[in-house]
UniProtKB/Swiss-Prot annotation:
This is DNA-directed RNA polymerase subunit beta'. GO terms for biological process: DNA-templated transcription. It is an enzyme of class 2 (transferase). Zn(2+) 1 binds at C66, C68, C81, C84. InterPro entries: DNA-dir_RpoC_beta_prime, DNA-dir_RpoC_beta_prime_bact, RNA_pol_asu, RNA_pol_N, RNA_pol_Rpb1_1, RNA_pol_Rpb1_3, RNA_pol_Rpb1_3_sf, RNA_pol_Rpb1_4. Gene3D superfamilies: 1.10.132.30, 1.10.150.390, 1.10.1790.20, 1.10.40.90, 2.40.40.20, 2.40.50.100, RNA polymerase II, clamp domain, RNA polymerase Rpb1, domain 3. It comes from Parabacteroides distasonis (strain ATCC 8503 / DSM 20701 / CIP 104284 / JCM 5825 / NCTC 11152).
Amino acid sequence: MAFRKENKIKSNFSKITIGLASPEEILENSSGEVLKPETINYRTYKPERDGLFCERIFGPIKDYECHCGKYKRIRYKGIVCDRCGVEVTEKKVRRERMGHIHLVVPVAHIWYFRSLPNKIGYLLGLPTKKLDSIIYYERYVVIQPGCVDTVGELDLLSEEEYLDILDSLPRENQLLEDTDPNKFIAKIGAEAVYDLLARLDLDSLSYELRHRANTDTSQQRKNEALKRLQVVESFRASRGRNKPEWMIMKVIPVIPPELRPLVPLDGGRFATSDLNDLYRRVIIRNNRLKRLIDIKAPEVILRNEKRMLQEAVDSLFDNSRKSSAVKTDANRPLKSLSDSLKGKQGRFRQNLLGKRVDYSARSVIVVGPELKMHECGLPKNMAAELYKPFVIRKLIECGIVKTVKSAKKIVDRKEPVVWDILEYVMKGHPVLLNRAPTLHRLGIQAFQPKLIEGKAIQLHPLACTAFNADFDGDQMAVHLPLGNEAVLEAQMLMLASHNILNPANGAPITVPSQDMVLGLYYITKLRKGTQGEGLTFYGPEEATIAYNEKKLDIHAPIHVYVEDLDENGNLVKTMVETSVGRLMVNEFVPKEIGYVNEVLGKKSLRDIIGRVIKACGVARTAQFLDDIKNLGYYMAFKGGLSFNLADVLIPPEKDELVQKGYDEVEQIMANYNMGFITNNERYNQIIDTWTHVNSNLSNILIKQLTADNDGFNSIYMMMDSGARGSKEQIRQLSGMRGLMAKPQKSGAEGGQIIENPILSNFKEGLSVLEYFISTHGARKGLADTALKTADAGYLTRRLVDVSHDVIVNEEDCGTLRGLVCTELKNNEEVIASLYERILGRVSVHDVIHPITGEVIVRSGEEIREDAAKAIQDSPIESVEIRSVLTCESKKGVCAKCYGRNLATNRMVQKGEVVGVIAAQSIGEPGTQLTLRTFHVGGIASNIATENSITSKYDGILEIDELRAVEAVDEVSGKKHLVVVSRLAEMRIVDPNTKIVLLTHNIPYGSKLFFNNGDSIKKGDVIIEWDPFNAVIVSEVSGKIEFESLVENVTYKVESDETTGLKEKIIIESKDKTKAPAAHIVDENGNYLKNYSLPLGAHVVKDNGDVVKAGEVLVKIPRAVGKAGDITGGLPRVTELFEARNPSNPAVVSEIDGEVGFGKIKRGNREITVTSKLGEVKKYMVPLSKQLLVQENDYIRAGMPLSDGATTPSDILAIKGPTAVQEYIVNEVQDVYRLQGVKINDKHFEVIVRQMMRKVEVVDPGDTRFLEQQIVDKLEVMDENDRIWGKKVVTDPGDSQTLQAGQIVTARKLRDENSMLKRRDLKLVEVRDAIPATANQILQGITRAALQTNSFMSAASFQETTKVLNEAAINGKVDRLEGLKENVICGHLIPAGTGQREFDKLIVGAKDEFDRIFANRKNVVDFNAMDKDDEE
């Protein structure tokens, strides 16, 4: 496919077009016809002439040597031998010269009639079955009925019918010209299809189909027409580039022989590429057919042979598509041309995107604690081999040897002189280290190598986190950057000491771990009652002297004068209480951040490193990290911090707690046996009991460990510092192992918990049964991990594929839109603070402090740390920030919308590949997510339910949408309101500034103790409600009557275990006509209100009871929302990114309105929503679902009517694009947060932006789009701009140039009409052009990746043949804008240092530039020349 310019391949092309090849093009690219199926002469091993490996066609096998040996050596280059016809040239031309095969009969290309959608079938309007019967020579097709009126065009005829018609025709009919409309023409095979395609008039077909799509009433026919239109339009769009008849081939190309090699094995056998077999079958059948035609064989035999030729060509192009694939002797299907492109082993992924490189090595890694942050240790032999060319050059330069060959020998012999030169060559020439799997960009970093003895690579211990490496036998690969630019990039951008921050969240990633943390924790911990406690020293030096003289313990609390920062950030001397250990640490801490006086655990270390980076920059941080690394290791060794069995303390209270647990369980079992509680409740209560025992034991245990040895218990120190181990693990060592999950068959059925806990811990040892139960979980864990890794890897791949072309392409796109950002809360607990969410983003508006009125941030400015802190501390609740979701860049995104680059803490630069970084940041922690679906069961999850709203502020209460009835508390006799509206919302407002301090929804049925407009004091309880039950409250007073309440049909009676009261519980009735309901009537029996009773409701009142307004009629236990399984972890992330609909979706209201209940039909209840304007929507909700609304409730659009998860497509349709974007971002964030993984929002936003790129055309208007077509947002905008202000001709009048339906500019129309007017002819009539309207759609990442503008990127992702197939017909052009396309073409990626604007730069020395600049009069001005050209 390379451009052949004098046989040179141009590599600086800027786009690639794909299309169908015409027979002429195939011949033009071919170097000769392959006539024989022979490959190689088995005796001479030379290619046969005119065969598949022929030298005359494809070029010589040996460099500059013809077949017969008449011409040898380079001096005959370019001569064509007169005896054997071989051109004398290099042998590598056999990699690029193509041949061809002339087929006797045309053959259909399998891609275009066997794949869906069936392209040839759609063009001709034939179903696949019929088309197959024509192509495979079973039926004749009528191409032109002529004078025969019994058949029509495209009718299929059997052979008998065909012959009958021929017989009935007059003799001279067959002698007519083919163009004569009276001639009857019917043909068979691909030839017939060729004729049909060649006769198509695409323009009129397009017009006819458009008309049909617009006017047809039947939806099915309309869809059919639209499908056909798409194919027709794609051929029309690629005008001249593609003709439909080229889907039928008369010539097929033969790929170059070196790409389908034939290798002789020992023993006279050959290993051959499958393609050779496939080509051979085509040639044999083609030649046999030629001969049969020459000897005038009977039609039957010919037809069979033609069919076999069609099948042979089919299997050559795509063997896997056929039902009867051609197999080898070993019963393995042969690999056809399509198979060599597909899949992981195909051309795209194996050879174009992932190549093996030279100058690389790999070895085991060991720890290098004495290395600097930017260094690694490289074994001598490895280095000598890697740097060989550089060493050789230096040896020759220094005059040690004269030739390259002798220099090589010296290096191979490893003579002493080599090592000195190697040292010299390695200076300033870093190597890249890579550990597989490379999950994010920190998996490859550059280091300055140091020569070491041995055979293992030494790695800096702080770089382990980024590589996810440990030293239990991990291996790493070394690569050597060769070019100057590569070396420079490795040093400036990839050096390990420059990559201290994690691009996923901006936190330091090179944080000391394990031993280092332990050592630092140990020396910074204070201990009372040690030698020298309470002494005061003048300065750190004195204290150190006292320590060295053994007069002072390292943990002793002492007072010292040190330099620390005051409020204004200036260094001053102050007295602090500290210890010698902390003084040691502070020797290394940069002065800019003051005196660090705290116990150093992993968390606090991370914060300190973050502060150091901000204050002192990267270089100083690297220095600081190395210093504390050394101190940490040294002190861990000095402290002798190991642990023994006696450090594992078992709390003495354990037996008592376990006994108590057994007693409770016995009580629960007794209740169950007496029938007070159901089996499910019993199970939940038992699980609950043991969970409590376990957590109580853990708390006692941790308390005890903390007290042990003044907190210097080794195990406790390891846990507390964050070096190793967790509370969970310590609990298992010395508490009890607790409850275990039952092994489940598949990930789908959430794991039940075994109700007998493991009471032993590891110190006491487990019994056989306990061991058996626990070993099961452990093994399953290992199996899960293996599966999970593959899943996470696949997720990353899809994410990269969808986002790789998101590059920062401009500074500012100038959009006025943004996202409103607030802090995220879950039940009043702040999950993500406003500070975290707005830091490093750009504000849309000026942010003004509401009380002081000062401007904190100007619009279009980055919100830096101090500004974010100021906003957080002020009463501002939300800030509108720029986001990639609202960015309006045409290509990629702009820097302002993206904000800060988290890896550098500065605004993102042009050319940063934010898409790939986002994909890696989300994919990399994927392996830490769980695979299982969480089981939420029992009371365990409902412990901390809030049941009231207490004011945290003084202020004034405002309430919206309130409907309430007064009621009196039976116990205290106080009055309160009972809320009966579902949309009530309360706000507390600051009385002076009117700023909203707190907003909250008021739950239905809650008690309200204040009125609208009341003053509230801090700590007042405003509202309270029953946290365990949803209720139905009577809104009026009256008598209650029940309908359809029949014992054991619609309800059953159960007794409450605590009170012994009997309750009626509504059950699902077999009799679907009965719908239980409660009516409230007045004395005269008039209905006042009725309430429908949902499943599982506990009816509190009896028939005929008198109720007061505000009394509870029905309780619906909340826990009835069954112990459901939440899809968690990786499957949930995949579900969201793929925009899949959940298994039990909620029914959602599309409008604001009042709820009404309709009839029950077929197990579904009809619910109507009526808006204030009278619009009515009907929804069918299955009876098995719990309803979330009552009759007469007023609800808002987007609110669910039934339980279940809301589908993303519903949110998009009802609440719009912004809502669905935020929904996906927040939902995915929740999954990661649950695992304690921090990822910045902007990464998710980048992916979601890519999911929302396309729109679906609803009404194409006068544009070139089709209905239901899916197109880029920008394309629709551009097309609408193009036809804006133009006119559509409705009646061309007497105009010669215009036709009906043509789109013209107003000016052209004016000229035309004035001309017609002058001649007194009929004028042209027009209407305004109508623009297209389109709906935003949400695509899953896989679909979005396949729909990119670049066909090469899509083809290398998935469904390769389908993508190429579509692209070829559309004559698509790939403009090489993303990363993948450029990698495939072997170009630099258009990002970072490969940005296209750098292509014009010339890099040179400074003095050179100064010299040119001084004599610049003589220098040609390139810019001026460019301008002239443009003019």
